[in-house]
Amino acid sequence: DSLARRHIKHPAQFLFCNILRLYQLQGDHGTVIDRSINELKNNPDNWSLWTFLFDSTFASVKNIEEEAKKRLLDRVVERILSLVAEPLNKMLRGPYLARLTLIRKLVENDVLASSLLDTLKLHDPLEYLFEYIRLFYSKPCCYVDLKPFLFFIKDDQVDNFMQRVSDFITLLKEEHNQEKGKTTNVHWADIVYQRLQRGLGLHEKLSAVEKRRAVTYMVKMIDCCSDSDLAAAVYAHLAANLLWDLYADNGNADALYELILLLEWVIKNHPSDPISAIVLCKAYSSIGVTTQVQRFMRALDIKYIQRDTLGYLIYGLLEQYGRFSSAIIHYTELTAFFDQTEKEVSECLTTAYKNGSFLQVPRLVEFLNKISKSFIAVGVDIQTRALSACFAVDKVQLVVDTMYGDEEPIDFLGLEDNRDFGIIPSFDANKEQQRLNEMKQRTYHEQIDVFQCDAMKLSHLLMKSVAAVGRSKCTLKNLSIYLDELKKHVEHCRKTYKEDDSLPNLLQSPPPLYLSELINTPKMDLLMLLLKSASSVVECSESIISSNIIEHVHEEKLLHCLPNVAEVEELVIALAASNVATGALCFHVTLRHCSMVLQVLSFAQLIIKLLEMVLDNIFAFSLGQGTKKGSFSKNQRKNVVLNRLHEVRTLINKGVISINTQLSDVHKLLKSNDLIPEISNDYDEAVYIILLKEQVQVDSSIVASYTDSIMDMQKTVKRMLNQSQA
């Protein structure tokens, strides 16, 4: 309809796909199949059409008889094979990928066994895989296209298949004279081969020496790709995976150090490679080098919405290593971003309704839901409140309000996991992808957990419980609600996160939150002891004020409510005990210990300060009642009780001072020779020199970052001691 086309702004292909989608929603799969088959003759490389065709075909075969099923599948196969045979389509990937996709869907849906493919005029999928490599090896996407179909290659077929690919590349090399330093089609063919080795699990069989020899080869190939950042990035990514294997599987700190040296060299020579920068963020975060992580994150061209999807790369990291001020600034910026995004999407939604653009409404609503319920957004809000209350805000009432947050409860079960782990590509479509999915689910649980067991909820309930003690309308009922929830949550966490539990340490993994270190140690015990005392004091306060009888105010009852000094001392000594980790690239373990202890002791200080406020209110009420009673004056009674609280505060301050001493001691270790590992001798001379040239800069960056963490924590210690004395 020419009149309709004149007034409709959308392209015809877009409208055609929308029409097919509506037919599918209506269940009219026959029409979708007919129209898709007809349109594919004109647009064989349009993957949306293939998707519509396959979805409707396999929705139909479930409900039709065998003869009709055979006719339908024959029709689909005929369309695919006719397009493959068309000479004009030789360089179009769509029909070839459609052929492989059809076979995969036939097998996965148990429609046809792979041994019966010839009944549909289809052949061995391995032949189709090799044909695809032969036709499209020069395209950077070749391996990515093939990855979903690698499961067709059985274990006993891997060697023969790889030999065929190797022979093909050898022929290519003989046919083409490679220009030194230039990326050619032969390089891309070799990249397909190297990726296949990784994807088919051949790297797992290599020894440490063989893996470093493979890295040597990758480095030399990077040197041959001086004109292509993309080709160099692929080789660098392969090398990084090999070195990460050595580190993650064998705890080889040398390999992690070599990975950092290698990627620093790659980024200098190929600055437009974002993958190497992101992998470097992962490597540096693994050893607590936060300054470098921040530097690379700032340098990356992160798109607006990627601040959410890639937020996991730095979430929880800065405060983990004592960079509290930097963490507060980072989270405050992210909070502003999420608030602004919600506002803008809401405005777009309103505009869509006003303009009658109703097709846009469902997508905008979905997008708004994903942004507003993003677990990174919720986590950022919680961390901002926690860190600000502990290390930034001075006024007690403002601290209480900050920790308490909104009245509206957080729906932890309804949060959206928007994390994009695909930003660091995975080579293996099966085993590695399975581990990636396991890691995503487990880290999602650790941070926002469907089973009520996560670091976010723990922080949230802890803050609510602490804030409830100091609220002007504090009641035992309100405090008990949060405290009971916190107790249940802590117990559940202890059952779920054992001390010896470890997450899959994949290259794509987010920085671990070390939740088990918090809940399975005296750190959490100290806070629970203080909160239990706070609950008892609040109960005593309610009893005294409601009775209006001054005799109820006596030091024995209040002293019984306060924490036992000996018990507090034992817990503080245990949690602040020195944890100096020795060995190459282990320094960050000490920093993490000091940082976590400071966060716990800061919460402990806040609880003591709020307890003091409650006691002041009790004695203020007592003084307002009039007469003296007994041998002690009211002020003397008050002093007896507050002296106990002073003893507890002194013990907590001793813990803070102990951490300060540890920080001063470990600062001297930054000059130690065993802080940084040596480069392995398994590389040849050329590669060894490349890594050696990066050593001075990398070493100084690591030491500088650790120094920054120590200095930041020492400033925090000074503030905590000053606040305690105020």
Question: Which residues does each predicted region cover?
Answer:
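Active-site-adjacent structural elements in folded domains
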Residues: 259-266, 297
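Non-TPR docking regions that flank or precede TPR/alpha-solenoid scaffolds in eukaryotic proteins
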Residues: 1-260, 307-726
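Catalytic binding pocket for nucleotide-activated donors in carbohydrate/polymer assembly enzymes
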Residues: 287-317
